[in-house]
Regions:
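Ordered, amphipathic secondary-structure segments that act as subunit-interaction surfaces
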Residues: 54-66
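Helix-start/capping segments and mature chain N-termini
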Residues: 2-50, 72-236
Length: 236
C-alpha cells in the first residue's frame, strides 16, 4: 500500500551530490510513515560510496528504497515497526553526460494539468502513478513535462519543483504538504540568497507563469533546467 520511501542521489565526477540533504529527507519521510531506518547515516553513506566505486559510476544516480518489510498477514493495519524489519534496496544507474543534458541547453516545454495526487506530497513515497500519467500526458502532445495546478495555483512538476522569474525576482511555492521539499530547491534558494537575489516563496498562478520573464525547474537528477514554453505560451 505504498509504504515505501525512496531517494535518488546524483553522482558527478564519482562524488555524491547533496547526500546529507537526501539522508535527512529520507529520515523525515520514514518518521512521517512511522517507519524506522535500519541503517545509520555512516553506514548508508558507506554503502552509497561502495556502490559508486564497484560500478565505476562517474556520472549517474544511486537509487535507494526502504519498504516497511514483510508483514505476517495482508492488512491495511501495518505491523509494529519494532517487530518488522524494513527491506532496503539500492541500485545504480550509469548516466554519462548527466551534467550536460542537451535538454538543459534547449529548454523544456510544459503543459498544465490538474493536481490529482494525494495530500501528503511532502513525503517521498513511491506513490507516483499520477505524476507518471502527467509525464505521459505531456509527451503525447509534444511537451517535456507537466506542471500540476491546484485551486488555480501551480504546485510543482511531475518530478521537479517549479519556479518563475518576474522583475528579477525568483518566485516559487513555499514548503508545505503540497509539494516535495526538494534538495536541489533548497540549494538553489540558498545560492540565490547568498548572491543577494530576491526570492519570494509563495503560490503563483498559471497566468503569472504565462507572463513570467523566465521560468525553470529543479530536481536532483536534472539539476536546473530552463522552461521555454507553458501551455503554448513562449517564456522569455
Amino acid at each position: 500500500y505504498k509504504r515505501q520511501v525512496y531517494e535518488v542521489t546524483s553522482v558527478l565526477d564519482g562524488k555524491l551530490i547533496d547526500f546529507k540533504g537526501h539522508a535527512k529527507r529520507l529520515n523525515r519521510s520514514l518518521d512521517e510513515l512511522d517507519m524506522k531506518n535500519p541503517i545509520s547515516y555512516e553506514e548508508l553513506l558507506a554503502v552509497h560510496r561502495e556502490l559508486v566505486r564497484v560500478n565505476n559510476i562517474d556520472e549517474g544516480l544511486v537509487y535507494l528504497q526502504i519498504s516497511r518489510g514483510a508483514p505476517s498477514d495482508r492488512d491495511f493495519v501495518y505491523p509494529n515497526p519494532d517487530e518488522t524489519d524494513p527491506t532496503v534496496v539500492l541500485f545504480t544507474q550509469n548516466k554519462p553526460g548527466l551534467a550536460n543534458s542537451p535538454l538543459a541547453n534547449k529548454g523544456v516545454k510544459i503543459i498544465s494539468i490538474d493536481d490529482e495526487r494525494w495530500g501528503r506530497r511532502d513525503i517521498k513515497t513511491v506513490q507516483l502513478l499520477y505524476p507518471s500519467m502527467g509525464k505521459m500526458m505531456a509527451k503525447k502532445v509534444g511537451a517535456d513535462d507537466a506542471w500540476m495546478v491546484q485551486d488555480g495555483y501551480v504546485t510543482e512538476g511531475t518530478s521537479n519543483n517549479a519556479y518563475i522569474i518576474k522583475n528579477n525576482k525568483i518566485i516559487t511555492r513555499g514548503l508545505s504538504n503540497d509539494i516535495l521539499h526538494g534538495i536541489t530547491r533548497a540549494a538553489v534558494l540558498r545560492f540565490a540568497k547568498e548572491a543577494q537575489m530576491q526570492v519570494e516563496e509563495r503560490n503563483f498562478t498559471l497566468i503569472e507563469a504565462y507572463e513570467a520573464d523566465e521560468a525553470f525547474i529543479t530536481s536532483a537528477s536534472n539539476f536546473v533546467m530552463p522552461v521555454i514554453e507553458i501551455d503554448g505560451n513562449k517564456i522569455g
